[in-house]
Every structure is written in C-alpha cells, then in structure tokens.
Amino acid sequence: MSTSLVSKPLASKAVVVFSGGQDSTTCLIQALTQYDEVHGITFDYGQRHREEIEVAKSLAKRLKITSHKVMDVTLLNELAISALTRDAIPVSHELMENGLPNTFVPGRNILFLTLAGIYAYQLGAEAIITGVCETDFSGYPDCRNDFVKAMESALVQGMDKQLKIITPLMWLNKAQTWALADKYQQLDLVRHHTLTCYNGVIGDGCGDCPACHLRKRGLDEYMQDKTAVMASLDASEPKA
C-alpha cells in the first residue's frame, strides 16, 4: 500500500463580470455548470440604474455563487460623461455625432476587464466571463470581439499569466440568449428578476429605452418559435 499523498486536482475557477442584467446573469448561470468556483464581480460606477447593484447582490445569493464582490469605481463617473452616468442627460434613441449611442460609457469595459483580470489573478482563476455581444448590441465599440481579444492579450502579457476572457454570448442574438437561459431552466428567473432597463425597472423594464426594446424583441422571437431558436442555439455551440 502506497503511503504517498494523492494531490487533489485544482478547482476550476472563473470570475464573472456581473451587472445583474439579462446577459451577465445568463453567463453566470452557465458558468455554474462549468466551473467548481464562480466568483462574481459587480462595479459601482455611479450608474443611472443603480438598482442593478442590489439586483446583482440578490441574484448572487439566490444562485449561491462562491463569492460576490462589489467594487467602487465611481471615479469612472467623474471622467466619463454619458446618459448612464448623468441623470440630467436623457437616454436618446438617436446616435450622437460620433455614431455612438449616448449611453456609451467610454472606457467602461476596459476598466471592468482590467479589474476583473486583477481579481482573477489573485483568486487563481483561469477565466473571466463577460456577457458582451457583437450580434445584437447597442453599437458599443467595447463589446466587439476584436476589443475582447486585445484585452485578453494585454492581461496575459501584463500579468504573465494564462487567462482567458470568455464571451458566451458574442455571436448569439437576443432570442438565442433567451434560449440559453431556458436551456438551464432559468428563463423565468432571468425574465423577472434581472435588470436590463436603462431607467431602472426590474424584469420586463420600462418598455421604452433601447435596452428594453432589444430585450423584448428577442424574447418575442424566442417565444414565437422556441424549437427553431433552440435548434439555432445548439447549432452555434462549438463541438467538442
């Protein structure tokens, strides 16, 4: 009989950038099936829809994730002028002169992914998961795949650590994102207990802001033909 110690395999760990909205909650739900430890990180940047922080706290407890950190990054609010950081600026359906929505917060995802990378480094996590998407998105340049790949390269080189930024929703449309939540039997939770609305209305939202329009259009498409949308989701998933 051997007396040597058998080393226990290291636990797989992921850090999820978690706002409490539809996309990040869906990513969190999926991560819970794929990693031994799932750590959520939520950023308080003085956002217009501050209710999302409390929503994120509630969902983190409900889903029983390993840990949940809320980080104060209100300096971003001082630097970045946007409809999401200034109550006096109404959310517009029109693009600004630079071709971007006035809800774009410059540097937000650069800062979020940098801080999530530092947190992942300290935890010994191998992955950062974020719900950015290039298929159905609001025109934000920091939601593009090229940006994410550049950030991943910067983090790996800057910290000399193998670290992946995983974007499960990057090539999904909103209907497929709803299907993904349903695949894990969490469609009702995502629909009724997340906050995507720019005006801070939980669940189906205000129905008027761009975020609500995008969310509702995707839900309607999914509910009209669940079988077809689920099949398209399955077809989009990478094969082992």
Curated annotation (Swiss-Prot):
Positions bound to ATP: F18, S19, G20, G21, Q22, D23, S24, T25, T26, C27, L28
Database matches in Gene3D superfamilies: HUPs
Task: Spell out the reaction equation it catalyses.
Answer: 7-carboxy-7-deazaguanine + NH4(+) + ATP = 7-cyano-7-deazaguanine + ADP + phosphate + H2O + H(+)
Which Enzyme Commission number(s) are listed? Answer: 6.3.4.20
Its annotated pathway reads:
Purine metabolism; 7-cyano-7-deazaguanine biosynthesis
Record keyword Zinc present = yes
What keywords sit in the KW lines? ATP-binding, Ligase, Metal-binding, Nucleotide-binding, Queuosine biosynthesis, Zinc
Write one Gene Ontology MF term. Answer: ATP binding
Q: Which InterPro entries does its entry note?
A: QueC (IPR018317), Rossmann-like_a/b/a_fold (IPR014729)
Task: Spell out the Pfam families in the cross-references.
Answer: QueC (PF06508)
Cofactor(s) in the UniProt record: Zn(2+)
Q: Which GO terms describe its biological process?
A: queuosine biosynthetic process
Comment on bound cofactor: Binds 1 zinc ion per subunit.
Q: For Zn(2+), which residues are the binding ones?
A: C197, C206, C209, C212
- Similarity section: Belongs to the QueC family.
Query: Function of this protein?
Result: Catalyzes the ATP-dependent conversion of 7-carboxy-7-deazaguanine (CDG) to 7-cyano-7-deazaguanine (preQ(0)).
What is this protein identified as? 7-cyano-7-deazaguanine synthase
